[in-house]
Design a protein with these regions (language model features):
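N-terminal intrinsically disordered/low-complexity leader segments
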Residues: 1-8
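Hydrophobic pocket-lining residues that define ligand/cofactor binding sites across diverse proteins
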Residues: 23
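The alpha-helix within a helix-turn-helix
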Residues: 37
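An amphipathic alpha-helix adjacent to DNA-recognition modules
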Residues: 9-20, 29-30, 41, 50-74, ...
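Residues within the helices of the helix-turn-helix
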Residues: 34
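Short functional hotspots where side chains directly engage DNA or cofactors
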Residues: 44
Length: 86
């Protein structure tokens, strides 16, 4: 991953974390792009470079959460399989 890709990825993660934090406080329907940008400490114009709207961010954030969640199982599954193989 080059420097530009890394920066893009890090910004996306900041948006994901900002949305998750805001979702702890209120329903998705009431979260604004301005609030997300403020929480992520990123300009609004940067938001629109990444997403068309808040629904796009929600889709990506859902994938981000699920990928992190399932990563715990893949490690455990491999160790379980290794135990049965012995």
């Amino acid at each position: 991953m080059n420097k530009s890709e890394s920066r893009y990825f890090n910004t996306a993660v900041r948006f994901n974390k900002a949305l998750l934090s805001l979702l702890e406080k209120k329903p998705f329907e009431y979260i604004t792009i301005s609030e997300i940008c403020e929480k992520a400490e990123v300009n609004r114009s940067t938001f629109y470079l990444h997403y068309e709207n808040t629904s796009d961010l929600l889709k990506e954030t859902t994938t981000y959460v699920l990928d992190n969640f399932t990563s715990y199982f893949s490690v455990d599954a491999e160790s379980i399989i290794a135990q049965f193989a012995n």
